[in-house]
């Protein structure tokens, strides 16, 4: 292959400047590689029909240094001298069911082609709607993984409908360092950038990818890489001469934690794919296109291989993206006003969250698994207590970041040492903006444009000269919903494994004030021995027993005693919380949970009470949920048994059943 050295000129890039374009020092280099490489592959698979997944395989191969170096004109001896005396490794990234490096071999005839954007161009933004890439700078991470040498191989269907193998090589190095690899010319300023391929013409210094299949197979064989065969389309990027120990430099955020994946590059990459692509990896429920069929060294990453945290994140993502009811997580709609064409309750998206125990995350002996903070390379800023962990993601399924403090977590309460609050926000990407511009027409485009080049955060932007605050409103709504939920709801404490959800028998607790006691909609029968709650005027309301019916409804048997001066009474359902009871009106308020009240009365009866009660009136909430019944009473003392049946759509809450007498001095009347 013949060499083409980039000329250094006005407004041109140099190797040194390219290597600094996306110098993200917050993430390990292997995380940056996984985020960029997998996203490129997923973007390349968007328009290929006939497949429900995008195949991505990342792994390590041996390098035959002399066999590889002989093909690179101008640096053959230098490579053999520098690397020939010791075993060398390469990282490869393979994708299939993708378009490949299409376009004219000579990029001058197709400057917007895939082949130019990946091999010969820089800062070429990805324009496909819903794509992950946007700035065109992320691919510079390839040059930082090894010595700056990258091999691009692709098998495509060309413009003539013929299958074609293509291969090119790029080298980007810091031209300011001593002992550079690219040969120097006395007549030219070093640029630090070179390509290898075949000459466009005998009298030109420009190169294009080679298409000689025999030569391509020989080059790939020197890198222990198999070519694509038959009709299989895709791309393989090979980065030779890596230093595995250098790539595994540890970020000692949690130095005492167990991190077995940091022992070798392949294991680290396997966890990194889970870390950043949990929503899409092996997820056949992914709603925005093809799921990610991930492999490490040719072995498929199955869900059984996931760390527990990442499997939970995927299930939470599905719950938020689909909006399905779930007994495992809390899912809240996020609504933003004044920016979108409609004001549906979930116009901005949904947030799913839950508090996990150490046992649920396999952190206890004998497994002794890592904490959530260790899994995502984040520090717990609170020390003895556990800070909340917030993830957010947009349509391509790559988690943008994990936050444990800052704007996403501000005001959220810490959990105790044995619990971890984990949340994920999934935007409603298709929501249209009220006043769009040519580039930003929906929420997905807004969030995409708001990202920095390394896609690690969202920040509000200006559209048509007007500053928007959509991201800030989303963060504020997410915080408020999570905070209100745990202030207004008593979380399920049942034992829940990864694949099964077992309901435990809980205790029926007395309410903090008023008459009545709680009926636990989440417990399958049983409870503490009931005790009567009496007033000084002789009124009382006692839960005698409760049981689940075959329909899933809860049947509550109670005993009631009412004095002569009680003219009527109301039996009402509330949701119990640490701060007191929550009525249906308060629950459904936009300033509170904002969803239909989860507990609904289906039947109430009083056996053997003929002539004791008068008219009854059902009371429904604003969202038509029957949550209370008011019943008139004769002017005589009454002592009777009653039966109330209700169902509850949210197992994360505990229902409180109260009786409110009217005409009673005790009741303030």
Predicted regions and their residues:
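Active-site-adjacent bridging/hinge elements
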Residues: 2-17, 90, 108-124, 205-215, ...
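Flexible ATP-lid and adjacent glycine-rich G1/G2 motifs of the Bergerat
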Residues: 79-84, 88-161
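Short, flexible loop/turn elements at secondary-structure junctions
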Residues: 43, 60-64, 95-100, 141-143, ...
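Bergerat-fold GHKL ATPase/HATPase_c domain
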Residues: 1-94, 102-116
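GHKL-type ATPase core
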Residues: 54, 62-69, 73-78, 134-296
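Charged regulatory segments coupled to nucleotide-binding catalytic modules in large multidomain enzymes
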Residues: 1-11, 246-256, 260-273, 305, ...
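Long, low-complexity, polar/charged, intrinsically disordered or flexibly structured peripheral segments
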Residues: 103-106, 111-115, 160-219, 223, ...
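Short helix/loop capping segments that flank catalytic or ligand/cofactor-binding pockets
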Residues: 46, 66-69, 101-104, 161-162, ...
């Amino acid at each position: 292959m013949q060499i083409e050295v980039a000329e250094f000129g006005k407004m041109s890039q140099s190797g040194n400047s390219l290597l600094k374009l996306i110098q993200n020092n917050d993430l390990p280099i292997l995380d940056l590689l996984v985020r960029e490489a997998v996203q490129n592959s997923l973007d390349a698979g968007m328009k290929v029909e006939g497949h429900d997944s995008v195949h991505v395989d990342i792994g390590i191969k041996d390098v035959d240094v002399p066999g590889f170096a002989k093909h690179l004109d101008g640096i053959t001896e230098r490579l053999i001298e520098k690397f020939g005396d010791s075993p060398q490794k390469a990282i490869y990234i393979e994708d299939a069911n993708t378009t490949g490096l299409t376009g004219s071999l000579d990029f001058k005839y197709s400057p917007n082609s895939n082949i130019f954007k990946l091999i010969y161009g820089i800062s070429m933004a990805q324009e496909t709607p819903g794509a992950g890439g946007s700035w065109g700078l992320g691919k510079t991470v390839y040059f930082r993984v090894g010595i700056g040498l990258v091999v691009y191989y692709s098998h495509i269907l060309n413009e003539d409908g013929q299958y074609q193998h293509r291969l090119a090589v790029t080298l980007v190095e810091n031209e300011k360092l001593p002992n550079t690899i690219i040969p120097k010319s006395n007549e030219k300023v070093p640029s630090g950038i070179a390509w290898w391929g075949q000459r466009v013409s005998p009298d030109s210094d420009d190169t294009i990818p080679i298409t000689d299949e025999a030569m391509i197979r020989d080059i790939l064989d020197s890198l222990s890489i198999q070519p694509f065969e038959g009709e299989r389309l895709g791309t393989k990027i090979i980065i030779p001469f890596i230093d595995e120990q250098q790539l595994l430099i540890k970020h000692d955020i949690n130095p005492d934690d167990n991190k077995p994946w940091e022992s070798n590059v392949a294991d680290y990459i396997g966890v990194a794919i889970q870390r950043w692509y949990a929503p899409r990896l092996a997820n056949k429920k992914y709603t925005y296109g093809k799921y990610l069929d991930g492999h490490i060294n040719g072995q498929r990453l199955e869900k059984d291989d996931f760390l527990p945290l990442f499997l939970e994140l995927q299930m939470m993502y599905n719950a938020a993206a689909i909006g399905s009811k779930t007994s495992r997580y809390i899912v809240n709609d996020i609504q933003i006003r004044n920016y979108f064409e409609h004001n549906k309750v979930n116009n901005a998206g949904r947030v799913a969250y839950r508090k996990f125990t150490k046992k649920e995350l396999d952190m206890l002996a004998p497994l002794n698994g890592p904490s959530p903070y260790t899994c995502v390379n984040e520090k717990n800023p609170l020390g003895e207590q556990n800070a909340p962990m917030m993830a957010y993601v947009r349509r391509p399924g790559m988690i943008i970041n994990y936050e444990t403090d800052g704007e996403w977590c501000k005001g959220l309460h810490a959990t105790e040492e044995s619990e971890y609050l984990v949340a994920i926000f999934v935007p409603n990407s298709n929501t249209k903006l009220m006043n769009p511009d040519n580039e930003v027409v929906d929420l997905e485009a807004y969030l995409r444009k708001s990202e920095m080049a390394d896609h690690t955060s969202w920040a509000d932007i200006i559209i048509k000269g007007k500053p928007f605050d959509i991201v800030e409103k989303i963060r504020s709504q997410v915080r408020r919903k999570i905070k209100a939920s745990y202030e207004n709801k008593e979380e399920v404490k049942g034992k829940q494994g990864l694949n099964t959800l077992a309901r435990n028998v809980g205790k029926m607790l007395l309410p903090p004030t008023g008459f009545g006691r709680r009926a636990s909609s989440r417990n399958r029968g049983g409870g503490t021995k009931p005790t009567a709650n009496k007033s000084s005027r002789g009124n009382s309301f006692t839960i005698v027993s409760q049981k689940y019916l075959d329909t899933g409804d809860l049947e509550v048997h109670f005993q009631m005693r009412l004095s002569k001066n009680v003219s009527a009474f109301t039996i009402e359902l509330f949701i119990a919380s640490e701060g007191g009871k929550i009525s249906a009106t308060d629950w459904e308020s936009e300033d509170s949970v904002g969803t239909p009240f989860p507990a609904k009365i289906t039947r109430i009866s009083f056996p053997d009470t003929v002539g004791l009660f008068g008219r009854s009136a059902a009371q429904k909430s604003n969202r038509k949920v029957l949550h209370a019944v008011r019943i008139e009473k004769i002017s005589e003392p009454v002592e009777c048994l009653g039966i109330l049946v209700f169902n509850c759509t949210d197992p994360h809450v505990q229902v409180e059943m109260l009786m409110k007498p009217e005409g009673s001095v005790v009741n303030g009347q």
